[in-house]
Every structure is written in C-alpha cells, then in structure tokens.
Amino acid sequence: MNFEHISREDNEIYALIEKELERQQNGIELIASENVASEAVMEAMGSYLTNKYAEGYPGKRYYGGCYVVDGVEEIARERAKELFGAEHANVQPHSGSQANMAVYFTILEHGDTVLGMDLSHGGHLTHGSPVNFSGKLFNFVSYGVDKETEEINYDVVRELAIKHKPKLIVAGASAYSRIIDFKKFREICDEIGAYLMVDMAHIAGLVAAGLHPSPVPYADFVTSTTHKTLRGPRGGLILCKEKYAKDLDKNIFPGMQGGPLMHIIAAKAVCFKEALDPSFKEYMARVVENCKELGEQLVKRGFKLVSNGTDNHLILVDLNNKDITGKDAEKLLDEVGITLNKNTVPNETRSPFVTSGVRIGTAAITTRGFERKDMEEIADIINETIINRDKDLEKYKQRVKALCEKYPLYK
C-alpha cells in the first residue's frame, strides 16, 4: 500500500505501521481470530467513504447526500444475504459484541434468562460472562462440554433448558473445535419455546464455504464478525428472519449506534464478494486441512488436544502434561516469532489470565500460502521451543524466519 502522505505528515505513526508490517511478515500468525485482509478490503477501509455520515438506513437517512453510500450498504446487505442464504442482513454493527448486544436488546428484557456456553469451556464474553454487559443485564445460565469427550452434550443442554426455561439459547463459541449441531439446538428451543441465536463469528468462513452446517435455517438470529475466517474488515454482521428485521434494525439504530462506518461497510461488501468466489471454498478447505495436520503433528510430539482433534479452523491445546502454562507458552513462542493466545481448557484449574492451554488457528497462515507440508515444521518449532525454553532460542527464530520468507506478505 502507498503510505506517502502519512509518512510525510506523521512519521511517528508511520514508523509503527511499518514496524507492525515487519512483525507480520516475519512471524507465524496462529491466533485463531486473526486473518490477513486483502488489499482490496484495505483500500475500501481507507477510501473517501470515511468522510460520510449516514445515520439511518438506505432511503431513510437523517442526513442529505447519502445516495452514494446507500448503494454501498445495499450491495453489502444483498451480498451477505446471498452468501449465507438469509432473509435479512444488517451490516451496520461495529463489532461482534455489538451485534450480540443488538439481538439481546431486540428480544430480551432486563433480567430475562438466557442459556449460553461457559467462557471457560469455549464460549465468549458476550455469552454471559459476569464481567460483561451480557452477564450484568441478563440472567445467564451456562452449559459446557462433557468432562470425558470435551464436546457439547446436547442431552445436558436440553436438561438445563427444561430446568431453567430460558427465553433465548445462544449457540456458538470462540474456542470450540468441533461441529456444532444447530438442528439439535433448534429442537431444544422449540421444545421449551425459546429463541435461538447463533454466534458464528469464528466459523462464518466455513459456513460460507459449505464446510460447516449453516445455522441460518435453524436460528432466529445469526451474528458474526467479518474479520476472522471471513477475511474481511473488523466489524459485525447480523442475519435474521424477515419477521424480526424491523425490530432488529431499530435496536441497532437508533437503539445502540449512531452513524454507521460506511468505509467499513464497503470493505464488508468487498469481503462478501471475495467469499462468494469459488476460490474461497478452496481456501477454507486448505484452512481445515492445515489445522487437522498441525493438530496431528502436535499429537505426535506429545501434545494433548481438547476433544482429541478438530473439525474446523482451530485447535485447543491442553498443556497440563507439558509443565508450562498457557501464559508462559504464549510469551515464549512470541519470542521466536509465533503468535498464539493463552486459553482456558475444560476443567480449568488456573486463572483465565494464566490458563492451562493455548488456542491455535490456521486461517491467517493459510491466507499467506502456508501448505500442509509446512505444518510439521511449525509443530516441531513449537515443541522444541517449549522443551528448550531455558536455552538460546535463536535457531528457532531463524527457522520461523525461513518459513516466512517462503510466503511473502503483501509483496
């Protein structure tokens, strides 16, 4: 990208932008919620559209001069509906958290009971964590994974639903590596008369590519981010049945947001177009293939995977048998150029700021071009770095650098 203006006007920020690019170019990105946006997406984010205020919706704005950005938002909405087979799409949420908040405000009253996945078992902050608005405003009851299989036990979910009679059940996760059965969640909701919301932020790309069952036919509302496996800008998205569209839209604007970010909505439209291309399905298939292979290579080196494997773009690694915490593993691997994040594991005994595991994803490295054959080397570097953590790590830094040089970023 051309940074001639910022390099001249604000060299301090320009220097940090260049430093971050260098970090990304020379590092292996394994954070499951990150990806590498295309230059087309980034150009949209940096476009003239950032200048336009557009409170409201296409054809019903509170400002003049919106006839151009109306077209942008209409394209984004139509592409989102086509991509996921949805009746209605709202592309205005600034984030996934705000998308979830908008759904809650559409169908819940303060204090209503909601059933969501426990954060320590793979859920998200907005699925009822007591430190989050969701846990403060609503009465969340949590379900988790089975102690033995480390997968969702739908019989237990049903029992909790019958016992607590939630008005809403939230399906979806931020650290769950297995296929989620949305049909079973729908059946449970129908049995007790509850709404179903699916947070597919992590798996949206897989759903778009047909590599994970779609929640759209089963859920009343589906929320997502656009920057994880969808490989777009940082932002949110909501899909819903047409009968909820009017109430949902007014809970986003004027309910909880003012002006939409039109440059980001344009970038969302670009990413939806990219995801509609047949090549995106091939990309997502490689993401899953790489993730499965990386998991298998780690298992060969004595690592334990939560639920013993993966069906998607991420693996959760239990480090209890490696005599290292998630926090220390994250810091250690960062030193050699591998970024991932500490993560709680089922039956966690440590603080969420320390943890007993790490979460690993392959979306970003696959975008960059990493292939299945590279997963063995990545697993080997991770393993040897942890084993030799008290020794000189320079040779592992060089191995990371050598891998990265094979797959240049933004060149």
UniProtKB/Swiss-Prot annotation:
Pathway: One-carbon metabolism; tetrahydrofolate interconversion; Amino-acid biosynthesis; glycine biosynthesis; glycine from L-serine: step 1/1. The keyword Ion transport does not apply. The record marks H227 as: Plays an important role in substrate specificity. GO terms for cellular component: cytosol. Keywords: Amino-acid biosynthesis, Cytoplasm, One-carbon metabolism, Pyridoxal phosphate, Transferase. It is found in: Cytoplasm. It catalyses: (6R)-5,10-methylene-5,6,7,8-tetrahydrofolate + glycine + H2O = (6S)-5,6,7,8-tetrahydrofolate + L-serine. Its cofactor is pyridoxal 5'-phosphate. Its EC number is 2.1.2.1. It comes from the Bacteria. InterPro entries: PyrdxlP-dep_Trfase, PyrdxlP-dep_Trfase_major, PyrdxlP-dep_Trfase_small, Ser_HO-MeTrfase, Ser_HO-MeTrfase-like, Ser_HO-MeTrfase_PLP_BS, SHMT-like_dom. It is an enzyme of class 2 (transferase). GO terms for biological process: glycine biosynthetic process from serine; tetrahydrofolate interconversion. (6S)-5,6,7,8-tetrahydrofolate binds at L119, G123, H124, L125, S351, P352, F353. The keyword Amino-acid biosynthesis applies. The modification N6-(pyridoxal phosphate)lysine is found at K228. Its main location: cytoplasm. One of its GO terms (molecular function) is glycine hydroxymethyltransferase activity. It holds the Pfam family SHMT. SUPFAM superfamilies: PLP-dependent transferases. Catalyzes the reversible interconversion of serine and glycine with tetrahydrofolate (THF) serving as the one-carbon carrier. This reaction serves as the major source of one-carbon groups required for the biosynthesis of purines, thymidylate, methionine, and other important biomolecules. Also exhibits THF-independent aldolase activity toward beta-hydroxyamino acids, producing glycine and aldehydes, via a retro-aldol mechanism. Belongs to the SHMT family. Homodimer. This is Serine hydroxymethyltransferase. It comes from Clostridium botulinum (strain Alaska E43 / Type E3).
